[in-house]
């Protein structure tokens, strides 16, 4: 008789995905982030569900309901800060995961890569709407600034903004619909993750060498289940250290002031994980130009498979491309720093230079360097 895990219609799917899955024997810790993102998503849905039980999506009571969660609900503070800092962990892992994909050429799995970019957009939208829910100063003004960007769209812009607001400003209707979207999107993300994995399992995983590994595969369980559990352990240690010792380290103090439409904070800025994109948005003095640059700064990821000009898939054996990869990482760190600074000299100039360098590195330097390395192979 066949083993149940190989014959049962449902368990069979799990078996082919997490147990008997043939996996390259040489994948490094950079391949841990996929499973960590899955754990993060589960954690966010779970903590979010418990927060939603006590939260009220109304402008008059939203702020005090969050305060109530922290003060009066059993372990409410823990759930709230795990959710807030869990989002930060989610984005750290997302950026590492994407960075890994760029470094090792995983973007050549076009279907997996493109659904991944769509996932990034969905997670960013979810995080933005979640940041609005506590209805603090930065929640309100962040929502006002970011939704206002849509007014730059020619002809339909102003109407579109008022349609999203559900009125003539960010108000009760906006908060209610943002809560509805923030609740439903993680489930849509979960469905997209399943499609992401479906496409990945069609081709199998990439590996650090970038070469075909069909001749050297090992079962996912127990080798990589153990490795993933170790990753989760490190993640939980980091997350719980953040939550227990410095829960507000990554937040904005302005969000502890209830939303006031009559008082604008001196520096409106998003959470740290959006700062690089915010810096690119601000570096262009034209509204529509800034919005296009903002969207394209993420959408550019979809061009990686097209821009790939090297004969080798991975950067493991391409030292010049490796240097450029780290230039890109440094560039993004500079943009993140600039996004949190006020709009004044010298930050404006640094931001503009970093924004130009970001696009120039991806669109011109990386493909041309890869072509040069192809020539060096013959030399």
From Swiss-Prot:
Annotated localization: Mitochondrion inner membrane
Residues the record lists as binding heme b b566: 97, 196
GO biological process: mitochondrial electron transport, ubiquinol to cytochrome c
Membrane disposition: Multi-pass membrane protein
Domain of life: Eukaryota
CC annotations in GO: mitochondrial inner membrane; respiratory chain complex III
Cofactor(s) listed: heme b
Listed PROSITE patterns: CYTB_CTER, CYTB_NTER
Bilayer-crossing regions: 33-53, 77-98, 113-133, 178-198, 226-246, 288-308, 320-340, 347-367
Result of changing residue 255 to K: In strain: Isolate 1019
Residues given in the record as heme b b562 binding sites: 83, 182
GO molecular function, one term: metal ion binding
SUPFAM superfamilies in the record: a domain/subunit of cytochrome bc1 complex (Ubiquinol-cytochrome c reductase), Transmembrane di-heme cytochromes
Subunit structure: The cytochrome bc1 complex contains 11 subunits: 3 respiratory subunits (MT-CYB, CYC1 and UQCRFS1), 2 core proteins (UQCRC1 and UQCRC2) and 6 low-molecular weight proteins (UQCRH/QCR6, UQCRB/QCR7, UQCRQ/QCR8, UQCR10/QCR9, UQCR11/QCR10 and a cleavage product of UQCRFS1). This cytochrome bc1 complex then forms a dimer.
Family recorded in the similarity comment: Belongs to the cytochrome b family.
Record's miscellaneous remark: Heme 1 (or BL or b562) is low-potential and absorbs at about 562 nm, and heme 2 (or BH or b566) is high-potential and absorbs at about 566 nm.
Role according to the record: Component of the ubiquinol-cytochrome c reductase complex (complex III or cytochrome b-c1 complex) that is part of the mitochondrial respiratory chain. The b-c1 complex mediates electron transfer from ubiquinol to cytochrome c. Contributes to the generation of a proton gradient across the mitochondrial membrane that is then used for ATP synthesis.
Protein name: Cytochrome b
Gene that specifies this protein: MT-CYB
């Amino acid at each position: 008789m066949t083993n149940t895990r190989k014959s049962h219609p449902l368990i069979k799917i799990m078996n082919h995905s997490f147990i008997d899955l043939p996996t390259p024997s040489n994948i490094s810790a950079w391949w841990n982030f996929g499973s960590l993102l899955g754990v993060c998503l589960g954690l966010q849905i779970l903590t979010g569900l418990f927060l939603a039980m006590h939260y009220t999506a109304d402008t008059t009571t939203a702020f005090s309901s969050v305060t109530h969660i922290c003060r009066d609900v059993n372990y409410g503070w823990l759930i709230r800060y795990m959710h807030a800092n869990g989002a930060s962990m989610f984005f750290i892992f997302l950026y590492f995961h994407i960075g890994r994909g760029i470094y090792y050429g995983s973007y050549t799995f076009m279907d997996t890569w493109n659904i991944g970019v769509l996932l990034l957009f969905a997670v960013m939208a979810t995080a933005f709407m979640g940041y609005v829910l506590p209805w603090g100063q930065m929640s309100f003004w962040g929502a006002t600034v970011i939704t206002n960007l849509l007014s730059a769209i020619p002809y339909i812009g102003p109407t579109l903004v008022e349609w999203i607001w559900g009125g003539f400003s960010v108000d009760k209707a906006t908060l209610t619909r943002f809560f509805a979207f923030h609740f439903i999107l993680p489930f849509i993300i979960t469905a997209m993750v399943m499609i992401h994995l479906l496409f990945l399992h069609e081709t199998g995983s990439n590996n650090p060498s970038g070469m075909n590994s069909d001749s050297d595969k090992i079962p996912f369980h127990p080798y990589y289940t153990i490795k993933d559990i170790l990753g989760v352990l490190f993640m939980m240690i980091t997350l719980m250290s953040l939550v227990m010792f410095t829960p507000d380290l990554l937040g904005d103090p302005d969000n502890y002031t209830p939303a006031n439409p009559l008082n604008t904070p001196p520096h409106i800025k998003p959470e740290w994980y959006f700062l690089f994109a915010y810096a690119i948005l601000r570096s262009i003095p034209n509204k529509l130009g800034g919005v296009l640059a903002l969207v394209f700064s993420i959408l550019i990821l979809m061009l990686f498979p097209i821009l790939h000009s090297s004969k080798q898939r991975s950067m493991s054996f391409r030292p010049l491309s490796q240097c450029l990869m780290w230039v890109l990482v440094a560039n993004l760190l500079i943009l993140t720093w600039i996004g949190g600074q006020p709009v004044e000299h010298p930050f404006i100039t640094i931001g503009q230079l970093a924004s130009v360098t970001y696009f120039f590195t991806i669109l011109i330097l990386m493909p041309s360097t890869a072509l040069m390395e192809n020539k060096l192979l013959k030399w």
